[in-house]
Amino acid sequence: MKNIIRFASLALSVITLLCAVSCGGTEKPAVTTEPTTTEAPASTEPPAPTELVIGENGKSQYTIVYAANEEYGHDTAFYLHRYFREQLKISIDYVKDSERPAEKAEAFEIVVGRTDRDASTAFRKKLKSGEFYIGVEGSSLYIVGRGEEETRAAVEYFIDYIAGTEQKSCKIPADLAFDSGEELSPVLEWEKSKILLSAGGYARMTTLKNGELAVGYSNGGIKFAISTNDGKGWTNTVTVTKPAKTPLGDTLTYANANVIQYGDGDIMVAYRAHSPTNSTKNFYTSIRYQISKDGGKTFGDPVIVVEYQRNDTDFKGFWEPHMVILPDGRLAMYYANDCIGPQDADYPYVPSGSYQHIMVHVFDYETETFDKGTIASNGVDHKSRDGMPVVCNLSDGGLVMVIEANWDKNYAFIIQMLFSEDGINWSDPVTVISPTKKGHYAGAPYVALLPDGRLAVSCQATQYSGATMSSDLVQNSQMNVYISKEPITLANCKDVNEKSFVKVMENPLSMGVETRSIWPAMHVHNGYLICVADIGTNLSTGVTGIYIRRAPIDTIK
């Protein structure tokens, strides 16, 4: 064995010598006494991840953690959980923070709201009212709002703009740090309280000449009420309508109240009156109004603007009257008309239920009656059910109208805008709001002029509702508010499109992820943008009531 080792050593020496000769000739190699250094090998540690894999192949190692002490914490977490499960097809669990204490918590959490996690507290301290933060800390994702409603808005934003739509997969940037206060505008500082106006529904407001706020709504008939403290409380409630029968003998149903004051102070309340929805007789439909000459204490007899009696029970007719003072001082009434009738009549009935017109009638102050009317927006020409018109004045003397329309087959309904110099002749409609997802719904629009010339637009929309989608889109809707980026006038109205408006991320009248806020309206009054809507439980017909929420105008930025 020793001989083998010696032979191997000798062979190695010969090979080394031959290599030295072949590489360096016969010269002796240089000898140095300096210490030799060897560079450290390159690091073999993997690079920092560029993304967080929330879910892959339909599975996730993450857990949604919500705040046990938040009223709607469970609902919001369940909303996110359901999105992962139903839309992305990713299995993910959710628990409250008390079930997964911070000191025992592991990584891989999606932390929602005001939990006991230190990072949640740190993020919330940096936020103002109406703001939220979505960001990564370590291997966990934090979705945190200043309050519960802001957290809900953050979850909606995460779903719509960050989570993606690829099924069985969800990956987000590892350096995600989104602050809505820095990235999004406008921001409205909604007042904390939501004010109960009444039971009932479909409320519409106006400011009277004496500075009081007036409202019309339906609740066992058409009601009229006054507020002397900017909507905080309501008094002097009057029932405008009286029980009556249709020409067919059915009990009249009243809805869609609208209020305006004109001239020397007369107050007009308009509404629709029609057969009940369960009528087994022919269908009767009408638009009516009543006038008060004593400040809303009493109202005169109803006057019919338009009426029709159909030969079947199809629920088609006249809907949602809205009134405005035109630039020339006249009073105009707009309403939706999907009344199917003879095409050779002197009134523009629609040929089928696939279409709906917007009508306009002008009021004669002397006779206190409206004219025969004309089409303001032609649903047949637009191949659409143009509906639910609301009109307001622009800062330069023009007029703007918002409608819901269904010509775009990608969506159930979208919101469109038209412009006019006189309130009679209107431009072609342009789309200003469409849902973020195909098949979804944005309807029942409203528009209000802000003091700086910008427009506030609201609608009810399913893309920001937490309800499980069903065939009834209305019952799955939440009130959304949008603000135009710049003042809108007749001079620049041709440039208006969807990019002209930015959504206020916090929905004003949400009472938890499984509630609806529908038939919304807005009104600018005494320094406030006041929102009103019917609030109830999603997927049911029971309405909790009509609620109001205010935002000081000077908080809009």
Predicted segments with their positions:
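Solvent-exposed alpha-helical segments and adjacent loops
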Residues: 36-184
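Intrinsically disordered, low-complexity Ser/Thr- and Pro-rich stretches
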Residues: 10, 32-33, 39, 45, ...
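Sec-dependent signal peptide cleavage junction
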Residues: 18-38
